Design a protein with these regions (language model features):
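Extracytoplasmic gate region of multi-pass secondary transporters
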Residues: 30-31, 217-267
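Cytoplasmic helix-loop-helix junction between adjacent transmembrane helices
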Residues: 105-145
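C-terminal ends and interior cores of transmembrane alpha-helices
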Residues: 84-98, 299-328
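Extracytoplasmic
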Residues: 11-43, 122-123, 238-246
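Central cavity-lining transmembrane alpha-helices of secondary-active solute carriers
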Residues: 50-68, 267-279
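Hydrophobic core of transmembrane alpha-helices in multi-pass small-molecule transporters
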Residues: 101-118, 319-349
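Helix-loop-helix hairpin linking two adjacent transmembrane segments in secondary transporters
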Residues: 99, 136-196
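Conserved MFS/SLC helix-loop-helix module at the cytosolic interface between two early adjacent transmembrane helices
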Residues: 61-102
Length: 377
């Protein structure tokens, strides 16, 4: 009976994995599009990042409403609404090729609503389908692996469409990437519409039991919420500030490293996150989230300490992952290498923190997922 039940979960799990990949594909678009809007609209460095920030600021507005939607209408309907919103958001970005920069930012903001809602769905659903504990963590790590693969594809795809001539970088040339995103949304909607997925939130709601508390009444959830807020800052901050430090001229206190080398080092950080998630997925069924998180955090702290104490004048030959999907070697300060290695540690932290934070929350899991998304911004 148990094996039959598990088999029935194969398609829902596969669907959640697909949604996980969709999230990073759309979330990853603003980064390569930043260079495009700079060229086409004459945007400043700050304005070029507005698409990226608009995407994540949307999480602050949509996180709690998304959690409420989960409780009220369930996982499937919430995901379907999110897919429609995402389709519209990317569609608005398509129009920006004719309607200007503000339209592009608006499209990124609307897409952010969709990404927030999908994140609110996939994380608790995978954890629930795995029964929480080790299996729940393992499924989230596997979904995270696909998330990393998709995130790797986006800049490569957009870079291929753009070519090497800077003056030819326009949204019109990048439209195929946006059309692919819209097609993915359309296919995902049709597949999810005809698929049956478990609805734990609706089953709990049918009990007509009044929610006497909120997720914030649970100490371990509050600690998890704080941890996820700090984690997101670390995960994004390490490659961002390392890249900035490498490319800043020496007069400005930086290392004045060539942008191509700096980009390869940052790309290696994200590639190591993919490797770490694949390893985490394979080990998730054998080790507890607490054990994995403890080891990853400890090693990460060690790498950061080494990055601080090692002199930046000490150079090493570091294997790097290049934007053309090849490997090479770059001469970088040893402190930068230790920062890049942190990607192995940050890789499994999201799944581990979420798994531990929602453990035992029961009917409060959906609301907890929404609160988590607010803290992502």
């Amino acid at each position: 009976m148990e094996s039959t039940k598990q088999k029935n979960y194969v398609l829902p799990i596969a669907m959640m994995f697909a949604l996980f990949a969709m999230i990073s594909f759309v979330t990853g678009l603003p980064q390569p599009f930043g260079a495009i809007v700079q060229n086409e609209f004459g945007a400043s460095n700050f304005e070029a990042t507005l698409g990226f920030f608009a995407n994540f600021i949307a999480f602050a507005f949509m996180g709690i409403p998304a959690g409420m939607l989960l409780q009220k209408i369930g996982y499937k309907k919430t995901a379907l609404i999110a897919i429609v919103v995402g389709f519209v958001g990317v569609g608005i970005q398509v129009l920006s090729s004719k309607m200007g920069f503000a339209t592009y930012v608006a499209g990124a903001f609307v897409s952010g609503f969709s990404m927030c809602m999908l994140n609110t769905v996939v994380n608790p659903m995978l954890n629930t389908l795995g029964g929480g504990g080790k299996k729940g963590n393992q499924l989230i790590q596997m979904g995270g692996s696909l998330n990393s693969v998709s995130a790797t594809i986006v800049p490569v795809l957009v870079g291929y469409l753009m070519g090497t001539v800077v003056e030819e970088r326009t949204i019109a040339k990048a439209l195929p990437a946006l059309y692919i995103a819209m097609a993915i949304f359309a296919v995902a909607f049709l597949v999810l519409f005809i698929m049956n997925i478990p609805e734990p939130s609706l089953a709990k709601a049918n009990n007509n039991a009044k929610n006497e508390h909120s997720p914030l009444a649970f100490r371990h959830f509050k600690l998890g919420a704080l941890a996820i807020f700090v984690y997101v800052g670390i995960e994004v901050g390490i490659p961002h500030f390392a890249g900035l430090f490498m490319m800043t001229p020496e007069a400005g206190g930086g290392l004045a490293i060539d942008s191509t080398i700096a980009g390869s080092v940052v790309g290696t950080y994200w590639f190591l996150m993919l490797i770490g998630r694949l390893v985490g997925a394979s080990l998730g069924g054998k080790f507890t989230s607490k054990a994995m998180l403890t080891v990853a955090s400890g090693v990460g702290i060690l790498f950061i300490i080494l990055a601080f104490i090692c002199p930046i004048t000490t150079m090493v030959s570091m294997p790097v992952f290049k934007s053309d999907i090849s490997f090479g070697v770059a001469q970088v300060p040893i402190s930068i290498m230790f920062m890049a290695l942190c990607g192995l540690c940050t890789s499994i932290m999201w799944g581990g923190i979420f798994n531990l934070a929602v453990e035992g929350l029961g009917k409060y899991t959906e609301a907890a997922s929404g609160i988590f998304m607010v803290l992502v911004c």
